[in-house]
Amino acid sequence: MVTYLLANFGGPRTSQEIVSFLQALLTDRDVTGGMIPSMLHRPLFSYIAKRRAPHVARQYAYLGGGSPIFQDTERLAQNLSQELQASVIPFHRYLPETHRETLQALQESQGSIVGIPLFPHYTFAVTGSIIRFFLQHLPEKPISWITQFGVHPEFVSCMQQHIRDCLAAQQIAVEDCYFLFSVHGLPQRHIRLGDPYAQQCQASFEALRGELEGKIAFQSKFGIGKWLDPSTQEVCQSLRTKKRHIVIVPFGFVSDHIETLHEIDHLYVPILLQKGYRVVRIPAINASSRWVSSLAAIVRSSPQETSLEPLLMP
């Protein structure tokens, strides 16, 4: 008997959870570690989270006060459970209010556990953090992990068809489009530590792009230090093409949330509109009717990692 653990980023369901969400995220040393000494890390980033909360709350107000990622992940877990004919337990990494229920369900599970982080590309800061969480909180339950699927044929074909379907629904010809494949950024210091994220993103981009005209860019930078480039904002500012439509494809995000629904729509789309382009943001792959069956195929055919130390931030 196999139990599947479907792990996503998590997001505040209401405005009341914004502070706890930000504190869980910013005090995670896999995300913000290395910036300051460890003894100062938690108190400083807890303070920063509280200071940032009003600003972030205004962004979430645009989404109705909370993120759709929670409900999307819960629904995906239910649908995937039916597809796999197995128990699928959802996990929301930075929504601490839900952790006790997840840990209890896993503790009571029988047989093996397979973790499915909903991130196409592996990074210490996200998938690595999820793996570390369970090593710390559930050490008696070994979990094998599907660590990446950005070049898996099912992901690539599902995403490509999703793009075509979205454009066809708006009667937009692919030939009249320039494609901006946007993925979450990462500090370059992580790459120097051996993080494979940049390489995996590039390989995934090349597989997805095929014959399409476009480029990859990195969004959502925060904090100090140099991050992967080019940034999505810089590409939008410098972009010159004879194509009428700019199609933004957030291919690193399985579910829509604040970084697609607010950041792309409010920061990047206006830049392109001011330059006279028509802009289309492709919804995250979670909106594809094929996604559940494609994810099930990915789960059935992907290798599982059991040697976990090399997967963690050094």
From Swiss-Prot:
GO terms for molecular function: ferrochelatase activity; metal ion binding. Pathway: Porphyrin-containing compound metabolism; protoheme biosynthesis; protoheme from protoporphyrin-IX: step 1/1. It is found in: Cytoplasm. One of its GO terms (cellular component) is cytoplasm. Its EC number is 4.98.1.1. Belongs to the ferrochelatase family. It is an enzyme of class 4 (lyase). It catalyses: heme b + 2 H(+) = protoporphyrin IX + Fe(2+). HAMAP family: Ferrochelatase. Keywords: Cytoplasm, Heme biosynthesis, Iron, Lyase, Metal-binding, Porphyrin biosynthesis. Fe cation binds at residues 184, 259. It comes from the Bacteria. The lineage of its organism: Bacteria, Pseudomonadati, Chlamydiota, Chlamydiia, Chlamydiales. This is Ferrochelatase. Its main location: cytoplasm. Pfam families: Ferrochelatase (PF00762). PANTHER family: FERROCHELATASE (PTHR11108), FERROCHELATASE, MITOCHONDRIAL (PTHR11108:SF1). One of its GO terms (biological process) is heme biosynthetic process. Catalyzes the ferrous insertion into protoporphyrin IX.
